[in-house]
Structure formats: C-alpha cells, structure tokens
Amino acid sequence: MSISLNTCILILKEHHLLKSSAVQDTVATKMDYVSYDSRDIQTNTLFFCKGAGFRPTYLSMAKSNGANCYVAEQPYPEGKGMHALIVRDVSKAMALLSAAFFRFPQDDLYVVAFTGTKGKTTSAYFLKGMLDQANGGRTALISSVNDVVGPKPEDSFKSSLTTPESLDLFRDMRTAVDNGMTHLVMEVSSQAYKKNRVFGLTYDLGFFLNISPDHIGPNEHPNFADYLHCKLQLMVNSRKCIINAETANFNEVYAAATTTTNPDSIYLFAREDFENPDLDVPIDFRFASQELDMKETRFKLFCATDKAKKLPINGDYTLKMLGDFNESNGTAAIIGAGLAGLNHDQCAKGIRNVTIPGRMQTERTKEHGMVVVDYAHNKASMMALMRFMQNEFNDPKIIVVVGAPGDKGVSRRPGFSESLSAYADKAFLTTDDPGFEDPKSIAEEIDAGIDHSKCDVTIELDRKKAIHDAIASAGPDDVVLICGKGADAFQKIRGVDTPYPSDIVVAQQVINELEGQDEHFRK
C-alpha cells in the first residue's frame, strides 16, 4: 500500500486542515508506510508528530530511519529536507490519511459500534457471537479485552486501548478485510471521540447503552458535559441508532441521533415495566426477566411497534452470563443482530454460550461462598453487580476487593465509596493500575468517603494478598466480589505494564489452597 503526497494534500485541503506544505521535489512522491512511532519506521514512511509527549528528537529519529514526510501542527527544524504537511489538527489528519492509506477498509465491512458507561464489552461480545453464528465466524472485534482481525488464533490479541489510535484502527480493519471478515463490532470510548481516533468514520449501527459520570478528571474529561458530548458523537455518526430508553440524559441522546438520522432508523428499547411520562416517542422493544439463577439468565424480548415487528427476533433468550443487568446488554445486541439480517433462532443460538474473560466469572466454593471475578470498574457497574448479588442471594454478606486506577478516572473514587457504603459489608481496598500515583493515597481517598458503620474496610495494597484475605474471610453463604481487573494480566505501574497473574488465576489459586480443590472458574 502507498499514498502520494498529492493525495495527502488534497484530502487535507478538502477537510480544511492544511495550513501549509513544504514539497522537496514532486507531489507525486509516494509514502509506502505510515507511523506515529519513531521506532517503527520503514523507507518512505509518512510520520505523524502527535501526542502531548511528542519531542522533536522523535522526528530526527524517524528521519534517520527512513521517513520522507511528516505531518505536524508546526514545522520542525529537525524535519529539514523532508516533505512537510503542517495541519490545524494532527489527530484529525492522521485519521483521514490513515483511512486513505489503508484504502478505506470501512467500505468493505458492516461496521457496528457500542458506547456507554457500562456494558460496551458485554454487548459487543454478544453481537459478535450472534453474527459469527450467521456468517461463519467472519466477525472482527475491537474491544477493551481482545481485538480479533481474522479467523485464526494468531488473529486475536490483547487490546491496549478500548478504541485504538486511528492509524492502528484502520490498519486492523484492512487486515480484517484481507482476512475475509465481513462484519466489525467495536467499542467506541468517549476518549476515542475526544482524541479523534474515529474521526471521519460512519457506522452502519450505533448503540447508546447508558451514561453516568465517569472518566472525569485532569487527564480525561474536564466535566460531565464534555463526557456526554463525546459520547453523543456516535449517534451523530451512525446510519441507524439503537438507544436504551432508560438511559440518563435520554432527551439529549435522542436529539443527537435525530440530527443526522431519520426517526424511522432510530430504535428504542427498555425493560417491560419501564415508564417515562415525559417520553413522547414509542419504545420499539421491551424485555422482561423470565428466570434468574446462578447458572443462566433467561429473558423474553417483545417487538412492540410496527417498525420493530419487521425484525423476526421476538421470543425467549438464554444467556450463560449472569446478572439481570446483562438482559439490557443482550437486548441491545439482539436488536443489532436483527438489523443485520438475523432471525430469532440464529440470535438465540449465537448468544446463548457467549462468555467474556473476566466478566461475571463465578466459582461456588464449599466453605467460602460464591466468588465472582468481574470487570466492574465504576460506580454504575459496581452498584448493578452488588444489587444483583444482594437480591439473588437473599441479602448475603458481601465482601468486595477493589481499587481505583491512578492518573485518570478520579471521579470513580467517590463513586466506589458510595457503592461500597450502600451494599458492601466488608471492603479490601487494593492496587489497580496506580500509574504514577501512590496506590496507598488512592485507597485512602476511597476509604475517606466510606460509611464505616455500614462497611468495614481493610487497606491491603498487595492485590494477591487482598484477594486471599477476602476469600479466606468469607463463610459458606457469603459473596466475594473481585472487581476492576477481570482477566488483565498486568498492573500499570509508573508507565510499565508489570506482569500480574490476573484476578481469575489468583482467585483460583486461593480457592485451591484453602479448599484443596482443583477446579476452574465457570466460563
């Protein structure tokens, strides 16, 4: 693949991004590789000078390694002798030029995206499971857990960002197309829009699951309004929109969808008993719990409007994943599958056995109750998880292991305090990706907001020991919730992904040690 300098100039001019250009010989010059990492350069590379931590020495390194053109928001002396494209916004430029370099792979895929404070990953996996059932496993995935760009085991790998940098995203999409994939299901984070990682991308289907305050802090969103604004961009950039009618800020979400989408292509869903007298648009799909237990989740989906009844998806569904909150995620995914052409039988078969590493993985022990590993990592997901456990186990003693990440998501900390005070009997506050912050200070900040008359607190920064002590302290009828990291096999500490066995592995080791059993978490 290659892209000419002239094509780059035309694209940047078309989007009013080009401020100036320095052409060394001819605009017919071609670039055969693209990169924003000075360590990843080939001969004739188009290099993007991006990021808050960018240093001119990176451009010098890229030049010496073979880059022949750079894109930046200002000219650099270090780029003397190179072609230069000076732009108003390098992140937008990188998205547009990467799409062109990789020959617009989105045009060869049916692209579906989920946004929401919680439920993105689960919904994405549910939909992938159903689409795979219909298309023979040709569904690509971009998620916070794994990325899948082909049918072979080596085509699946651990993701580093919920939504990759635009260059990586379009490269992965091209790989998926070349590997025969026909559909792409992806999570789109608020940061993806704030940092223009998906700039210029239009989705066939866009889902808005829910919203509550999260990712608000110095290095993320300055306030909730900014967070909401970024989330809403998915609605503006989708051909068809699926919205949870129960979401907070529904009016803003629906209004954003209608700016670019005809109401006939906007679908609403909600629980059967949900009522909102202020809602002046019909709810197309309803769902209702059939049975909840610690083995399966069963619910029924109703097509309530004429528009909804055109999709043959009405009926009963079973999920292997536990939690009544997953019924909403499942409903969203089923609607998406219906819009992609699937019927009830295909959906029911495809969704039934979907599991996600680190999401609602459970182990019933003999002497230490029910142990649950889940990725719940904000107030909304913690509240939903503990509420479900309280109801399902008839008000058990709830023991929670949790920590908050450093350098971001500062708003999560009071949310953890509030949720633990509301539902937990005992909390072990521990380390969870502290970054450059002191994990003890983070734990103490959470502890300061907890009502200690309701929740007993232990600060144990060694996460493995915290998990051990939590399980060891539990009785046969108790519930132990290990929250936040799921299947992550690392801790982000001072800029380094430090190896960590994962909560699932640690919890199983503890259970085996305490009870002498050699079993594995329910998948």
Swiss-Prot record:
It comes from the Bacteria. The keyword Cell cycle applies. GO terms for molecular function: acid-amino acid ligase activity; ATP binding; magnesium ion binding. Carboxylation is probably crucial for Mg(2+) binding and, consequently, for the gamma-phosphate positioning of ATP. Pathway: Cell wall biogenesis; peptidoglycan biosynthesis. Belongs to the MurCDEF family. MurE subfamily. This is UDP-N-acetylmuramyl-tripeptide synthetase. It comes from Lactobacillus acidophilus (strain ATCC 700396 / NCK56 / N2 / NCFM).
